[in-house]
UniProtKB/Swiss-Prot annotation:
Belongs to the BLI1 family. Component of the biogenesis of lysosome-related organelles complex-1 (BLOC-1). Its main location: other. GO terms for cellular component: endosome. This is Biogenesis of lysosome-related organelles complex 1 subunit BLI1. Component of the biogenesis of lysosome-related organelles complex-1 (BLOC-1) involved in endosomal cargo sorting. The lineage of its organism: Eukaryota, Fungi, Dikarya, Ascomycota, Saccharomycotina. It is found in: Endosome.
């Protein structure tokens, strides 16, 4: 009888320990699953940001392209201003030459 009581007590202890192991395992698995879900959420968020950054990259590329065009236009305007100055000097010389001919 004592053997049965001891065996029963041991079985209770084993059952209690097994329940604790099951609880800790379930809690650990649950925590792991929650953490995994959170990490996937963070990953999706970061991936969406990267996609938005591609839009920013496209915007920067467009601005650089437009800046290049603007620089080219500024050079052309400067060349036209220089050409206009040369024409102005040429016309002034023609006017001076005509005045001299008229005065002679």
């Amino acid at each position: 009888m004592r053997g049965k009581a001891l065996k029963s007590k041991l079985e209770e202890l084993v059952d209690g320990i097994q329940q604790r192991i099951d609880f800790v395992t379930a809690t650990g698995v649950s925590s792991f699953e929650q953490e995994t879900e959170q990490n996937y959420g963070k990953l999706e968020y970061l991936q969406s940001k990267i996609k938005k950054d591609d839009g920013i990259s496209d915007w920067v590329d467009e601005k650089q392209r437009l800046s290049g065009r603007l620089n080219k236009l500024e050079k052309q305007v400067q060349e036209l201003e220089e050409l206009a100055d040369e024409w102005e000097n040429y016309l002034q010389l023609l006017a001076d030459t005509k005045l001299r001919k008229d005065n002679v």
